[in-house]
UniProtKB/Swiss-Prot annotation:
Function: Probable transcription factor that plays a role in configuring the spinal circuits controlling stride in vertebrates. Involved in neuronal specification within a specific subdivision of spinal cord neurons and in the development of a coordinated locomotor network controlling limb movements. May regulate transcription during sexual development.
Domain DMA: 251-286
Name this polypeptide is given: Doublesex and mab-3 related transcription factor 3, truncated
Tissue expression per record: Expressed in the spinal cord, in a small population of neurons located in the ventral horn and around the central canal.
Entry keywords, A to Z: Developmental protein, Differentiation, DNA-binding, Metal-binding, Nucleus, Sexual differentiation, Transcription, Transcription regulation, Zinc
GO cellular component term of the entry, any: nucleus
Record's keyword annotation contains Transcription: yes
Localization per Swiss-Prot or TrEMBL: Nucleus
Example GO molecular function: metal ion binding
Domain notes: DMA domain interacts with ubiquitin.
Residue ranges of DNA binding: 29-76
Length: 300
């Protein structure tokens, strides 16, 4: 741009200037150069006065630009094909890398053909294991044996969750009766893990047992079993969690947290659930760990 505010520099006669170091070449407009005008190419294409010129020199420039664009496209295609030929077929079948920030990005993805044996997970506290097992038992559908019993007309899912029933009885097989007659504590089918010794031993329905059509009687070998209350008491070093049996699998996780932790504020439970990514078991573990830390601070 000259002193008069025009972006064009008209070529004149040679002007004597002192010699200086050669600078980096600045791109110029070829069409303006054909017509004796020197103009910088940056931001000039839309405003070039000769952009619609159809003289022989400008037509030659157009053809040359088309040839250069075709050559660049061909070179890019050849470069992509050469890169694809270098990659083996085994690497092409692998999935792409996970997005940054994902928690699973830290663990390497094993190949789909080989499945190496994974090391056993570290042991967690007994209260966390008990809460996780109880939540899985309450939220997941029951196994086939329990589903066959639930299919009977005299014992429905609503009757299991209803506390107003007078008898609260349930029919069991001879195998369960033999296990119940043993002096050992009866193990829970869906909630027992070897790492959690404090898991409560409760049957599927949590009700009294009717043997040989007689009167219902509660089990004396399970101290944490209550026939009058439809709740599962989970006791551990961090406290006791009361889990109602009437929880259904279609309940939202926030409602389940409100039932398990009635003393906590709903807003706090919602924030913890969002922080755990909607995982109900992780949220219960966080709440139990916070409760254990608070009790330890009170003792000190």
């Amino acid at each position: 741009m000259n002193g008069y505010g025009s972006p064009y520099l008209y070529m004149g006669g040679p002007v004597s200037q002192p010699p200086r170091a050669p600078l980096q070449r600045t791109p110029k407009c070829a069409r303006c150069r054909n017509h004796g005008v020197l103009s910088w190419l940056k931001g000039h294409k839309r405003y070039c006065r000769f952009k619609d010129c159809t003289c022989e020199k400008c037509i030659l420039i157009i053809e040359r630009q088309r040839v250069m664009a075709a050559q660049v496209a061909l070179r890019r295609q050849q470069a992509n094909e050469s890169l694809e030929s270098l990659i083996p077929d085994s690497l092409r079948a692998l999935p792409g890398p996970p997005p940054p920030g994902d928690a699973a990005a830290a663990a390497p993805q094993p190949p789909p053909t080989s499945q190496p044996s994974q090391p056993p997970p570290p042991q967690r506290p007994a209260a966390e294991l008990a809460a996780a097992a109880a939540l899985r038992w309450a939220t997941e559908p029951q196994p086939g044996a329990l589903q066959a019993q639930l299919a009977k007309p005299d014992l429905t899912e609503e009757r299991l969750g209803d506390g107003s029933s007078a008898d609260n009885t349930e029919t069991f097989s001879d195998k369960d009766t033999d296990q119940r007659s043993s002096p050992d504590v009866v193990k829970s089918k869906g909630c027992f893990t070897p790492e959690s010794p404090e898991v409560v031993s409760v049957d599927e329905g949590g009700y009294a047992v009717q043997k040989n059509g007689g009167t219902s009687e509660s089990r004396p070998d399970s101290p944490k079993y209550h026939g009058e209350q439809n709740h599962l008491l989970i006791e551990g070093p961090s406290g006791t969690v009361s889990l109602p049996f009437s929880l259904k699998a279609n309940r939202p996780p926030l409602e389940v947290l409100k039932k398990i932790f009635p003393n906590q504020k709903p807003t706090v439970l919602e924030l913890i659930l969002k922080g755990c990514g909607g995982d109900l078991v992780s949220a219960v573990e966080v709440l139990l760990s916070s409760r254990s830390s608070a009790s330890a601070a009170d003792r000190t």
